[in-house]
């Protein structure tokens, strides 16, 4: 059994060995075939690569030859252009040489002619000096003087044209802003009286007001500081005094006494005290109402009281509080038209005349007094400057200051806003005509439009058109320095030339 197994094992080993050898032989045969095929493929690839390399070399050689031909052609073209330019330059050079020769000849001719002209000029100058009895220096001075006159004339024309253009543009813009502001500011107040008239129920009341031996009227005048004028006017007593607040106190006290009927010194003193308290309350209320209506908030209480006191002040008959409110409206509206914040402009306008509430108690111009009061109560520097500068006492430091000055002038110049005494009015008109007539060449002058315009007729043979311009400026300067007036005064110079001939 074991032998059989061993024989079987040997047989299996032998068979496997033969099979392995057969597979090895087959693999070797395949390897050789693969090697042979690879060698054949490598040879083919080598030949193909050599062929491609030869084709690439041929292509490169052709491209190089083509590029070389193109470069040679370009070089030849450039050479031809250079040759053409050289020929052109030669021609131009020849032409320039010819022109230089011609110019040299012309220059020589010019020099010869210049020499002859100089010689002729010297002869003519000598002849002119003999004929005119003027030396060359004198003639030069005369020529310079004539030239100066011509330049001055041209300069005056240019200045006039520029002034007219600037005035047209400025007037147009200013009129737009001011007209818009005025249209939006509906001012309905008129000039107010500076005296008070108290009506009486009958003429017998006059005797009771006077009292025994005049003690009642003396007590009332002493306590109020106001003069009582009792004359033949029926059923009326006139109160006259320097201080409008005192007049108001006297009016209220007198009206209360008339209603009460008991008029004696003790009762008068009691009523005067009540009237003073009533006026103080009214002053505060008026100040607060003014700030409310104008939209100006945050004022110090003392400034509010001073505003209220302006109700009892007038300037040329115009109520100062109403005027201040109108200036605030106008300044604010103009600031809005200019694209600015109207708050400061309105505040400055409302306070611009605050100094008039105290200027009879403190010495100095009301503008500077008002600015000091505003500064004392912590108003901004813009407001302080606007108050101080609205009459030109100091320089403007802001646009708001200029707007306040303009609004003040508009409010004051509005027809019916202010009035003057007849005597001051007549004196101002006479002074206007006197200033105009003081200039040489003035034929006559008229102050018209209630003193807001002076019309001047000049002699045309003495004053030319440009002299009129100079005269108008000089007259304006004198009016501004010598006269005091509300608003503005127009100086209108008229020069008329007439030529008359008669046909026979």
Curated annotation (Swiss-Prot):
Domain of life where this protein originates: Bacteria
PANTHER family: RIBONUCLEASE Y (PTHR12826:SF15)
GO molecular function, a single term: RNA endonuclease activity
Protein role: Endoribonuclease that initiates mRNA decay.
Metal-binding in keyword set: no
Sequence ranges assigned to domain KH in this UniProt record: 194-279
Cellular-component GO terms for this entry: plasma membrane
Keywords noted in UniProt: Endonuclease, Hydrolase, Nuclease, RNA-binding
GO BP terms, alphabetized: mRNA catabolic process
HD domain mapped to chain residues: 320-413
Enzyme type, top EC level: hydrolase
SUPFAM superfamilies found in the cross-reference section: Eukaryotic type KH-domain (KH-domain type I), HD-domain/PDEase-like
Name of the featured protein: Ribonuclease Y
Stretches assigned to coiled coil: none
Stated family: Belongs to the RNase Y family.
EC number(s) per entry: 3.1.-.-
UniProt source species: Clostridium novyi (strain NT)
Record Pfam families: HD, KH_1, RNase_Y_N
């Amino acid at each position: 059994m074991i032998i059989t197994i061993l024989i079987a094992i040997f047989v299996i080993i032998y068979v496997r060995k033969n099979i392995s050898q057969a597979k090895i032989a087959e693999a070797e045969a395949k390897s050789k075939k693969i090697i042979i095929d690879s060698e054949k493929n490598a040879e083919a690839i080598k030949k193909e690569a050599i062929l491609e390399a030869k084709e690439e070399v041929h292509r490169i050689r052709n491209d190089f030859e083509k590029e070389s031909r193109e470069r040679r052609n370009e070089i030849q073209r450039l050479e031809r252009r250079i040759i053409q330019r050289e020929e052109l330059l030669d021609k131009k050079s020849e032409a320039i040489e010819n022109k230089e020769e011609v110019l040299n000849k012309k220059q020589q001719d010019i020099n010869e002619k210049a020499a002859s002209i100089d010689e002729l000029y010297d002869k003519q100058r000598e002849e002119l000096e003999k004929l005119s009895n003027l030396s060359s220096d004198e003639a030069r001075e005369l020529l310079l003087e004539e030239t100066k006159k011509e330049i001055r004339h041209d300069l005056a024309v240019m200045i006039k044209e520029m002034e007219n253009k600037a005035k047209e543009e400025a007037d147009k813009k200013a009129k737009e802003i001011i007209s818009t502001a005025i249209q939006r500011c509906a001012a309905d107040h008129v000039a107010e009286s500076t005296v008070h008239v108290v009506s009486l129920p009958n003429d017998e009341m006059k005797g009771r007001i006077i009292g025994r031996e005049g003690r009642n009227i003396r007590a009332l005048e002493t306590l109020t500081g106001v003069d009582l004028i009792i004359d033949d006017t029926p059923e009326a007593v006139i109160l006259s005094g320097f201080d409008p607040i005192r007049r108001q106190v006297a009016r209220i006290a007198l009206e209360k006494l008339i209603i009460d009927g008991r008029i004696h010194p003790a009762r008068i003193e009691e009523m005067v005290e009540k009237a003073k308290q009533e006026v103080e309350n009214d002053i505060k209320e008026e100040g607060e109402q003014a700030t409310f209506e104008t939209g100006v908030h945050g004022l110090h209480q003392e400034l509010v009281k001073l505003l209220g006191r302006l109700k009892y002040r007038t300037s040329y008959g115009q109520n100062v509080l109403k005027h201040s409110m109108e200036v605030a409206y106008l300044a604010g509206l103009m600031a809005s038209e200019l694209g600015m914040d109207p708050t400061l402009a309105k505040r400055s306008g409302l306070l611009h005349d605050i100094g008039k509430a105290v200027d009879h108690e403190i010495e100095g111009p009301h503008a500077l007094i008002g600015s000091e009061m505003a500064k004392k109560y912590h108003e901004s520097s813009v407001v302080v400057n606007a108050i101080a500068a609205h009459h030109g006492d100091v320089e403007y430091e802001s646009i708001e200051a200029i707007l306040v000055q303009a609004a003040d002038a508009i409010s004051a110049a509005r027809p019916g806003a202010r009035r003057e005494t007849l005597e001051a009015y007549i004196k101002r008109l006479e002074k206007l005509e006197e200033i105009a007539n003081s200039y040489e060449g003035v034929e006559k002058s008229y102050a018209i439009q209630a003193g807001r315009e002076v019309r001047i007729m000049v002699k045309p043979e003495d004053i030319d058109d440009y002299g009129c311009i100079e005269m108008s400026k000089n007259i304006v300067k004198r009016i501004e320095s010598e006269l005091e007036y509300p608003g503005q005064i127009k100086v209108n110079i008229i020069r008329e030339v007439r030529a008359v001939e008669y046909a026979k």
